[in-house]
Amino acid sequence: MSAQSVEEDSILIIPNPDEEEKILRVKLEEDPDGEEGSSISWNHLPDPEVFRQRFRQFGYQDSPGPREAVSQLRELCRLWLRPETHTKEQILELVVLEQFVAILPKELQTWVREHHPENGEEAVAVLEDLESELDDPGQPVSLRRQKREVLVEEITSQEDAQGLPSSELDAVENQLKWASWELHSLRHCDDDATTENGALAPKQEMASAGESHEGPGTLNIGVPQLFKYGETCFPKGRFERKRNPSRKKQHICDECGKHFSQGSALILHQRIHSGEKPYGCVECGKAFSRSSILVQHQRVHTGEKPYKCLECGKAFSQNSGLINHQRIHTGEKPYECVQCGKSYSQSSNLFRHQRRHNAEKLLNVVKV
């Protein structure tokens, strides 16, 4: 992106998989005080997330000099935060939201971003909704399994709408299972018994809730956690959530007796029992339990792919697809086998690799 004077057009090149490049011209004007104003038609701009990513990934080598670099960063930041249409409080919330999502484990980052929260409160509500669906030690095992199945169905239906191959769907399913268990484990650290070396021993039901393979090995997600064949290890209490003791859970599920502090959380929870899917697609009739999932599904019909790779321009309908794709460029392989140390960029490949270890173990047992 080249630097332009205030009187000239500022050209932002947005990669597009269907074209070599799509040029968005933003006419900048000069106000009476000599500062930069704008006659931008905000409705025709790409999603602010595109400009946020460009702002964060901008490099000094992308500009001819320091003055041009500052100018381009200022423009990208303006197109992200949009001070012409947002209040100071809204801009503050956008910055807080970005940092909050950034400190979450990667799987939870994907889950939150798929729901497109516009501020910190909406992001918290997304996590609280997920939290309300997770295991409750006082509930029957069958109900806990049913909850997990509902969550897995939601995320896999999102990726199925994108037309991913079965191997990628397996990866998404397992990512949600382990991210859900992670959030539950972090919340209930004090309720779990510790092993001799300080690792937390999870509930036995979690092992039976997954597929026939063993745990996903070491998952390097930037937080001190270790997923190793059914054992979870991380500093006790570090991520414990502090609740407001004055906040009472006044909403009770008539089916299972679980309490909720918000009526909206109870409504979502009750769909586990009723199987209700009130959000239907007018194009194909497929129904979903949440409106956010319907929005994701509708991209099958519209062809919308708002998540673009800044490296090659390839576009995706889901943010999780973009995250997986970017590992091709970065070479990141966060999924490591604890038995041999081999790493993979996709969790599905790790699971497939671990099945070979399991088969070898079985053969050794048979030989003995």
Curated annotation (Swiss-Prot):
State where the record puts the cross-link Glycyl lysine isopeptide (Lys-Gly) (interchain with G-Cter in SUMO2): 22, 27, 147, 177, 236, 277, 286, 361, 367
Query: Which PROSITE patterns does this entry report, sorted A to Z?
Result: SCAN_BOX, ZINC_FINGER_C2H2_1, ZINC_FINGER_C2H2_2
Any single GO molecular-function term of the entry would be: zinc ion binding
What does the UniProt keyword field contain?
DNA-binding, Isopeptide bond, Metal-binding, Nucleus, Phosphoprotein, Repeat, Repressor, Transcription, Transcription regulation, Ubl conjugation, Zinc, Zinc-finger
Tissue expression profile of the protein: Widely expressed with highest levels in heart, brain, liver, skeletal muscle, kidney and testis and very low levels in spleen and lung.
Phosphoserine modification sites are 132, 142, 274, 292
In this UniProt entry, the residues modified to Phosphotyrosine are 335
Question: What the entry says about post-translational processing?
Answer: Sumoylated.
**Transferase as UniProt keyword:** no
Its GO CC terms are: nucleoplasm; nucleus
State where the C2H2-type zinc fingers lie. 251-273, 279-301, 307-329, 335-357
Record region (Necessary and sufficient for nuclear localization): 251-301
GO BP, one annotated term: myelination
Report the coiled-coil segments: none
**Upon deletion of the gene, what happens?**
According to PubMed:20080941, most mice die by postnatal day 25 (P25) due to myelination defects. Brains and spinal cords isolated from P14 mice appear to be smaller than those from wild-type mice and to lack white matter. Mutant oligodendrocytes arrest at a late stage of differentiation. Expression of genes expressed specifically in mature myelinating oligodendrocytes is down-regulated. According to PubMed:17064688, embryos are severely retarded in development and die at approximately 7.5 dpc.
Note whether Chloroplast occurs among the keywords: no
Cross-link position per record: Glycyl lysine isopeptide (Lys-Gly) (interchain with G-Cter in SUMO1) = 27
Question: What InterPro entries does the record tag this protein with?
Answer: SCAN_dom (IPR003309), SCAN_sf (IPR038269), Znf_C2H2_sf (IPR036236), Znf_C2H2_type (IPR013087)
- Domain SCAN box, which positions? 52-134
Write out the annotated subcellular location.
Answer: Nucleus
SMART domains, alphabetized: SCAN, ZnF_C2H2
Question: Which coarse location class describes where this protein primarily resides?
Answer: nucleus
What function does this protein fulfil? Transcription factor required for myelination of differentiated oligodendrocytes. Required for the conversion of oligodendrocytes from the premyelinating to the myelinating state. In the developing central nervous system (CNS), involved in the maintenance in the progenitor stage by promoting the cell cycle. Specifically binds to the 5'-TCAT-3' DNA sequence. Has transcription repressor activity in vitro.
Q: State the similarity comment.
A: Belongs to the krueppel C2H2-type zinc-finger protein family.
Specify the protein name: Zinc finger protein 24
